[in-house]
Amino acid sequence: VVVCPVDPYVDNIYYEAVEQLQKLAEEGNANLTLMGIEPTYPSEKYGYIMPLSGEKVSKVKEFKEKPNKETAEKYINENALWNAGIFAFKLSYLLAKAHSLIDFTDYRDLFNKYDGLKKISFDYAVVEKEESIQVLRYSGDWKDVGTWNMMAEVMADKTKGKVVLDEECENTNVVNELNIPILC
């Protein structure tokens, strides 16, 4: 199983890396396989992966979700990678982990207990505590396009589709997926 966010800005080798991630998970050398990104600044928005080596695929010494800025700087100085939010694992691992964290007998029982489950992310509940993790270093283009500001930054043109911008429009980006012109 490979879990991916839907909002990264990536190049085509990203998809090859996701395939490689899936193959690494199938091989079973670790319970979890993560994709690591070379950090460009100390961020409190990402988890940090501390690999044991500088190789393309490495065992992980430690994973820390969203540290403060000072700790993020320390991790970067120790060659940590950002967690891209991409996890690969065998389904049997996830089922065993779910049973160890939640007392349930079958899907219906789990469904009935859903509202009472603790609200905690996979990163905190599972990844930070997992001892058997490996990381695949991703070297292509990657940006987390989770905000409109970042979307505007990665757009090559200020407009997409049938758009006419007035000369006085400032700080305006328009994406028009309709066949009807937009005048701004």
Annotated model-derived regions:
Residues 4, 31-33, 42-45, 80-82, ...:
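Short, basic and Ser/Thr-rich N-terminal targeting/leader segments
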Residues 5-12, 58-63, 81-85, 112-113:
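Flexible, glycine/proline-enriched loop segments at strand-loop-helix junctions
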Residues 8, 39-42, 67-69, 88-93, ...:
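Glycine-rich beta-alpha junction loops
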Residues 89-184:
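Left-handed beta-helix
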